């Protein structure tokens, strides 16, 4: 079976308790009591019916029933994103974002399967102040669920739309936090490859968080290259477009395009269609507005060097070379990493449940996670083995006991981004999710996170119970934003 069902068994000499007397169930409990309890003995063994209640003996079983839907935050072809509240177990009352994906739509598309697997694996393995945190991952017969920290500040795209352009000090702050996040990914051999305002969220305090890791490439260390054609055209480096092979330097080109976008109102190379946009990226002239300071002009030029070996950040120094540029001379990097620097913008939020920074077209909808009775074949389900995950911080809190901490611009289009990503197609559809390196993973779909148990039977066609609807009357909430990916 997949690694998710691997159990570490005692194999050392003497682990069987040499010299200790053998015993039977009758030595522990009289036979009559065993039969009264519904257990029958066969020789020295007992037969016990395996049910959900008999194998789920841990302090918490994670599943859709643990969350109450509050609002719809976004919607796409892959599924929905909800704001939810945890109503059972550890972190009772905490607000999360819940991404729900339909398995049937994912398995029929190579790129969506690759996207989902990459995002799930990277969210588990990478922890950083400026990268979104994954709390839980679980699945039912027809759906996948990712429970993420709720970033109520909305997308940087929305904020940039409202402001038009940023002052250099504002742009410097966001670019510096993004630089630290990219540097951390690169140190783990991960290329991000889809940096754009839509994939950068703001926390309630105004700090950035990178999201959407489906186009990432893993295991790309110094000297390694990859050839996959993917990303969002306006932010794609020329070496991706000409398919000569690329490495982590593509992220610094994208950061340069984002910097240009922040300071001028649009990416550096745009046209009426993708073909002409690509031509401009490959051979067009970079035009910088005269109002940029010399440091900003110099950094933008160095980010947007077409030769990746000449691009700032493209050498061995990676993010360290970017951090040393005079544009960031006023940044205290230690304070920035510790989030001791006040953000230039702090979202105006009335409560943890405030969704005013998201698109009102979605937040006005009644949140419903409809039952899905789709039954996938055994071979199709192979793509989702090992999906379940519980964050180590959650496991720690389970061990310690329950905690309660309810804690004027025309080029852009706010309704939906005109920039759609191109996903990679090179992958093995049955390459499973990486098993957690830490505590044992809960059994599929929602078995206990702490106690190892026998593997559960494969999913049946029985539809899972829908997540409970919000109590009371749905309040109308105002706000703007754009949908999911």
UniProtKB/Swiss-Prot annotation:
PANTHER family referenced in this protein's UniProt entry, alphabetically: RIBOSOMAL PROTEIN S6 KINASE
Start-end of Basic residues biased regions: 474-485
InterPro entries the record matches: AGC-kinase_C, Kinase-like_dom_sf, Pkinase_C, Prot_kinase_dom, Protein_kinase_ATP_BS, Ser/Thr_kinase_AS
Domain of life: Eukaryota
Reaction it catalyzes: L-seryl-[protein] + ATP = O-phospho-L-seryl-[protein] + ADP + H(+); L-threonyl-[protein] + ATP = O-phospho-L-threonyl-[protein] + ADP + H(+)
Name of the molecule in the record: Ribosomal protein S6 kinase beta-2
Family: Belongs to the protein kinase superfamily. AGC Ser/Thr protein kinase family. S6 kinase subfamily.
Residue numbers of Phosphoserine PTMs: 15, 417, 423, 476
Annotated organism of origin: Mus musculus
């Amino acid at each position: 079976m997949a690694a998710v069902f691997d159990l570490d068994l005692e194999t050392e000499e003497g682990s069987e308790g040499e010299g200790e007397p053998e015993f039977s169930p009758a030595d522990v409990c009289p036979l009559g009591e065993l039969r009264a309890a519904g257990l029958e003995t066969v020789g020295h063994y007992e037969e016990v019916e395996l049910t959900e209640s008999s194998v789920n003996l841990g302090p918490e079983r994670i599943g859709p029933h643990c969350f109450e839907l509050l609002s719809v935050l976004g919607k796409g072809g892959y599924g929905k994103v909800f704001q939810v509240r945890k109503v059972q177990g550890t972190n009772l009352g905490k607000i999360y974002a819940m991404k729900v994906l339909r398995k049937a739509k994912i398995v029929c598309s190579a790129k969506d399967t690759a996207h989902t697997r990459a995002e799930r694996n990277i969210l588990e393995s990478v922890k950083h102040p400026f990268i979104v945190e994954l709390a839980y991952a679980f699945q039912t017969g027809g759906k996948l669920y990712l429970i993420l920290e709720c970033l109520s500040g909305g997308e940087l795209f929305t904020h940039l739309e409202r402001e038009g352009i940023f002052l250099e000090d504002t742009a410097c702050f966001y670019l510096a936090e993004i630089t630290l996040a990219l540097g951390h990914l690169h140190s783990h051999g991960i290329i991000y490859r889809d940096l754009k305002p839509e994939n950068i969220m703001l926390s309630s305090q105004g700090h950035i968080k990178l999201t959407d890791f489906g186009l990432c490439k893993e295991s790309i260390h110094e000297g390694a290259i990859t050839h996959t054609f993917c990303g969002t055209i306006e932010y794609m480096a020329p070496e991706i477009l000409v398919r000569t092979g690329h490495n982590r330097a593509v992220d610094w080109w994208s950061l340069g395009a984002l910097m240009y976008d922040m300071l001028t109102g649009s990416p550096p190379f745009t046209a009426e269609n993708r073909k002409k946009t690509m031509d401009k990226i490959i051979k067009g002239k970079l035009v910088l507005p005269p109002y940029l300071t010399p440091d900003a002009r110099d950094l933008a030029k160095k980010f947007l060097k077409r030769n990746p070996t000449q691009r700032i950040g493209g050498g061995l120094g990676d993010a360290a070379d970017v951090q040393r540029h005079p544009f960031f001379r006023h940044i205290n990097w230690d304070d920035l990493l510790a989030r001791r620097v006040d953000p230039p913008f702090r979202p105006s939020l009335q409560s943890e449940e405030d969704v005013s920074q998201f698109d009102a077209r979605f937040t006005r909808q009644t949140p419903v996670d409809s039952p899905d009775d789709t039954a996938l074949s055994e071979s199709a389900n192979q793509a989702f083995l090992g999906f379940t995950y519980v964050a180590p911080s959650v496991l720690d809190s389970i061990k310690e006991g329950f905690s309660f901490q309810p804690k004027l611009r025309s080029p852009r289009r706010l309704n939906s981004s005109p920039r759609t990503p191109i996903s990679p197609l090179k992958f093995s559809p049955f390459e499973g999710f990486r098993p957690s390196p830490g505590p044992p993973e809960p059994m599929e779909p929602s078995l206990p996170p702490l106690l190892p148990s026998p593997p559960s039977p494969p999913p049946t066609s029985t539809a899972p119970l829908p997540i409970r609807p919000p109590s009371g009357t749905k309040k109308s909430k105002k706000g703007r934003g754009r949908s999911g990916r």
